[in-house]
Every structure is written in structure tokens, then in C-alpha cells.
Amino acid sequence: MFSKDTYISRRQELKKLVKSGVIILFGNNNSPCNFPNNGYYPFRQDSTFLYYFGQQRDGLVGVIDIDNDIETLVGDDIDLVDIVWYGSVDSVHDLAEQVGVHNSAPMKSLKTICNDAMSKKRKIHFLPPYRHDIKIQVFDLLGIHPNQQKDEASMDLI
């Protein structure tokens, strides 16, 4: 992992390039084999998420609200059952602080963030999803069918 300042600088540059709206960068989720905590493949984080948010944990989403200058790391803290599988891990708040993000929120808040932006007719920027679970998540959040997501993805991010 790079220094906190590296990630802060990268996100600042991204905000300058995109100029307005809300950027949503999805991290990867685990790829389970036959049980949610039985990862079939070694976990590999999405490269774009890793570049801007630096965290290797699954189930995270980075949100950059350019107009309000708010950055949020969204994800759920692990529960007692997960501790059996993963051991002790940092909270989402701690993961956010490690990369210079001052806000963290549970995954359920991502829908509220998206609904708020859409109700105000703000542009929501996202990259074309390549994994089926993220395509479903984009559909749930933004109402964009998986067959249309590549066309609806933000050219400013590509």
C-alpha cells in the first residue's frame, strides 16, 4: 500500500478531470465456491478501486462526490461469524482513514447516496462492470439493465 497522501493526490486529480457529479468505484467481492466465505479463487481487488482507494478487502465501494467535495468508503464491518473465517480485521472507518478518506458508511447507505444524486439530476459516473455481481449491484442502485451498463458507463472515467 502506498502512503495516504498518494491516494489523496490521485483522487484530487480524478476530481479535476471529471469536474462534477458523483463517482462510484466498485471494489470486487469475493468469489465463493459453495459457501459465502469459501472463496474459490485468491481475492484480487479491482485495479481502479485499488488505485484510488488502496484497500484489498472485498465488499467495498469508493464514492467521490465532486460537487460537495466528500469522499466516502462504503462497506460493512465484518460480524462475529466472519471473524471465525478472517480473524480480526480493521473496521471500514479505519480502512478509510488509512487512505485519507474521512467518511465511511455501511453498504445500505449506497442506495441513499445514489437516490439523492439521481433525485437532484446529478451525473453518476461508473466504469463498465465486468463481474456479474457488480452488474446486479449497478442495476439495483441505478436501475440500469446489465445489457445497457457498458453504454451508460462514464466516458470521463474511461
Show the residue positions of the predicted features.
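A composition/biophysics-driven feature that prefers long, compositionally simple stretches
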Residues: M1-I158
